[in-house]
Each structure stands twice: as structure tokens, then as C-alpha cells.
Curated annotation (Swiss-Prot):
Gene: Lamp3
Primary location recorded for the protein, binned into one broad class: other
InterPro entries, per database record: Lamp2-like_luminal, Lysosome-assoc_membr_glycop
Family stated for the protein in its record: Belongs to the LAMP family.
Protein's UniProt name: Lysosome-associated membrane glycoprotein 3
Species annotation: Rattus norvegicus
Positions annotated as glycosylated: N55, N225, N284
Length: 408
């Protein structure tokens, strides 16, 4: 019983206190709470602007207040100089009404001007009607220092929060224009020696000649007529320059590198062309078709030497590498073509075909006579050697047989 009596007494006391609190709320609807917030930010940046700046003056006015709220701030004029320092101190005491817990909000202010600014010691009060008409700062940021200010805002039941942007530029303030794309590119583009770090396309040197002869690399060159082959050639090409001096004539050799050569051409029903272009020169081969035969009718070339900047060119008309249409022509031995008095072209291990193709492969192979002229003497020598060896063996056997008869 005593315990129950104590509990009833406690409940009655709580009811009386709650009833009195509600009566007080009705009589005094304005319950005051105070929040004092001070944010101090110090920023110092030393930078040298890309362009000389004239002396300019900027003012900043702090704005916003709701009912009994007030905000204090101060701003002094700033002078822009060639070498800029920023020292910014801002004290923002804020007093608001609050009955609810306080929440944290982070504010970020960005400045782009390289300036020397000291903010302190003025006070301004703004009516409640101007809060919703606060203009935002027009200053835009590009590669600038950033001040991080952490503030606190309170929310009342059924009321709006204070705006996050509280700074408005005065009519006398000078703002920085928005940087254009060309300005940003010019600032980020390296100048002077830094430009050497940019990548560049390597230049292929012009032909350099040697005084000795060496086998040329075999390359495969094709010309397409739509999706079908028109010309296909596998060969090694060397250009020889003959220079006549006061005492004697010297020859300089240049082998065409297939990896540095671009093949192109023109396909026709009677004439087709193969163009081989490389740094410092080119070669042109013309194929002509007559009835069921085709052949190489013209060869031309030009070449520029890198060290002397001399250009050699020539063209020769002939009828060579003749074969049947649909067949391919092959010649392993070297073939020399005199293009001019000072320019000569040599081909080696050549295998080519023009006009009619079946698929992407060569047709029936027709070999050149020069290959036969090389092979026939070799075959003749081998036959003679075999005959001599056979005669020697025959004589040795006859001698053995004659000695055996004498013993009997």
C-alpha cells in the first residue's frame, strides 16, 4: 500500500507540472533560445597573375535576416596587385530562434581573384522580406583556392531554414568574368621548354645510299579492284644511282624497305598500274594486256638523296615479263632496268601477276628464260661430272677383270 500511494503521488506531480507547462506555452508563445556561432577563416595565397591587373576595389555586403535574427559581418576594400596575397578573416555571429536540436551544414566559398583582402568591422541589418531575393555571387572559380566554412543552421517546426548563400556583391564590386575554353587551354598549355614533352609523329628519313650491293628485302604488294585482286607482286627492288666524277664513276645503292612502302594502283581492262611510294621516292610499274597475253610495258622511278638533296628520276618503256593471261610470272635471277643515264632499277626474286585472278593466289607459274640460262649450265656441269665419274668406275672394273684372267 505505501508503494502504490507513492506512485500515485508521483503521477499527480507530473500531471500538474505538464499542465502548468502547457498553460505557460499558451501565455508565452515565444520561447527564446540563443545560438551563437562564430566562424573564422583565414586564407593566404601568394600567386603571380598571368596578366598585370589595375587597382580595383571590391566590397562585400552580408545579407539575410529572419524576424528577430541578425547577422554581423564586416568588409573592407581590397586592392589588387601584381603579386597578390589574400588574408581573409570573417566573423559571422548568428542568433536564431530554436526549439529543436541543431544540425551541422558545410558551406563552401570559392574565390578566383588573386587579391589582398581584409574583412572586418561593419554591421548590416536586413529585413525579413529581402531574404528570398538574395542574389548569388557572380564570381566563378577557375583553378582558385577554396575556403571551407563549417556553420550550423537551426530548423523550427513549420519554418524554413536560413539560406546557405548569405553574401551579396555591392554595385561597386568588380567580378571576374567566366573563363573561356581558350583561356583555360592557354593556361594549361606548357610554354617554353615544357612544349618539348608533347608527343610528335616521328619523321621517316629520306633514302641514304651505300656504296656496296646487298640483297633487297622481299615485299608483297597488292592492288584491289573493289574486293577482287587486280595486281599482286612479290619482289625485292633496289635503286642504283651512278654518279660520274672527275676520276671515276661510283655507284650508290638503295634497297626499298617493304615495311616503309605504301602500295596503291589503278586497275583497267587493258592497262593497270602499280605505285610504290616511300619517303623520298616512288616506283611505277605499268602492265599492258593484249588479247591473251600481258606484260610489263613501262617502269619509272624517282629518288631524292637526303644528304645532297639531289633528285634522280627516269622512265623506260619495254616489253618484259611476258606471260599468258591467268598465269603468273616468276624470275629468281636479278633483272636490271636502265631508267636514265644516272638511275637504274634492279629486281630480284620477282613473282607477279596482273588482270585475271582466281581467288587471292597466283596462277600457273611461267618462269623467265634467264632462270633457265642459269640452270642449264649448272645441269650440264653436273652431267659432265657424272659422266667422268662413270667412266672412271668403268675403267677400274676393266683393269680388275684383266688381272684376274692373267692369274688363271
Amino acid at each position: 500500500m505505501p508503494g502504490q500511494t507513492s506512485a500515485v503521488a508521483v503521477l499527480l506531480c507530473l500531471a500538474v507540472i505538464l499542465h502548468g507547462y502547457q498553460i505557460r506555452e499558451k501565455e508565452f508563445p515565444e520561447a527564446r533560445g540563443y545560438l551563437q556561432y562564430t566562424a573564422t577563416t583565414t586564407e593566404q595565397i601568394t600567386a603571380k597573375p598571368p596578366l598585370p591587373l589595375t587597382n580595383q576595389t571590391s566590397h562585400a555586403t552580408l545579407a539575410s535576416r529572419s524576424k528577430d535574427d541578425y547577422i554581423q559581418t564586416a568588409a573592407e576594400t581590397s586592392t589588387f596587385e601584381d603579386t597578390a596575397h589574400i588574408t581573409m578573416k570573417t566573423a559571422i555571429p548568428v542568433t536564431t530562434k530554436s526549439l529543436l536540436p541543431i544540425s551541422s551544414t558545410s558551406y563552401t566559398f570559392v574565390r578566383t581573384n588573386n587579391s589582398h583582402m581584409t574583412a572586418s568591422s561593419t554591421e548590416d541589418t536586413i529585413g525579413s522580406g529581402s531574404i528570398t531575393h538574395l542574389p548569388f555571387p557572380t564570381t566563378r572559380a577557375s583553378l582558385a583556392a577554396v575556403n571551407h566554412i563549417t556553420g550550423r543552421s537551426t530548423q523550427l517546426g513549420g519554418q524554413t531554414t536560413l539560406p546557405k548563400a548569405l553574401f551579396t556583391p555591392s554595385h561597386e564590386s568588380t567580378t571576374t568574368q567566366r573563363p573561356t575554353l581558350s583561356t583555360i587551354v592557354s593556361e594549361l598549355t606548357p610554354t617554353g621548354k615544357d612544349r618539348s614533352t608533347t608527343s610528335s609523329v616521328p619523321l621517316v628519313p629520306r633514302p641514304t645510299f651505300v656504296t656496296w650491293s646487298s640483297p633487297a628485302k622481299i615485299g608483297t604488294y597488292e592492288v584491289l579492284n573493289g574486293s577482287r585482286l587486280c595486281i599482286k607482286a612479290e619482289m625485292g627492288i633496289a635503286l642504283i644511282v651512278q654518279e660520274k666524277g672527275l676520276d671515276s664513276a661510283t655507284q650508290r645503292h638503295f634497297n626499298i624497305d617493304p615495311s616503309l612502302t605504301h602500295a596503291s594502283g589503278k586497275c583497267g581492262s587493258q592497262n593497270s598500274n602499280l605505285f610504290l611510294n616511300f619517303q623520298g621516292g616512288s616506283v611505277n610499274v605499268t602492265f599492258t594486256k593484249e588479247e591473251n597475253l600481258y606484260y610489263v610495258s613501262e617502269v619509272g622511278a624517282y629518288l631524292t638523296i637526303s644528304n645532297t638533296e639531289k633528285t634522280y628520276q627516269g622512265k623506260s618503256t619495254m616489253m618484259m615479263f611476258e606471260t599468258v593471261v591467268g598465269h603468273s610470272f616468276k624470275c629468281v635471277s636479278e633483272q636490271s632496268i636502265q631508267l636514265s643515264a644516272q638511275l637504274q632499277m634492279k629486281t630480284m626474286n620477282i613473282h607477279l601477276q596482273a588482270f585475271d585472278f582466281e581467288g587471292d593466289s597466283f596462277g600457273i607459274v611461267d618462269e623467265c628464260l634467264s632462270d633457265y640460262t642459269v640452270v642449264l649450265p649448272v645441269v650440264g656441269i653436273i652431267v659432265v661430272v657424272l659422266c667422268v665419274v662413270g667412266l672412271g668406275i668403268y675403267k677400274i672394273r676393266q683393269r680388275r677383270q684383266s688381272s684376274a684372267y692373267q692369274r688363271i
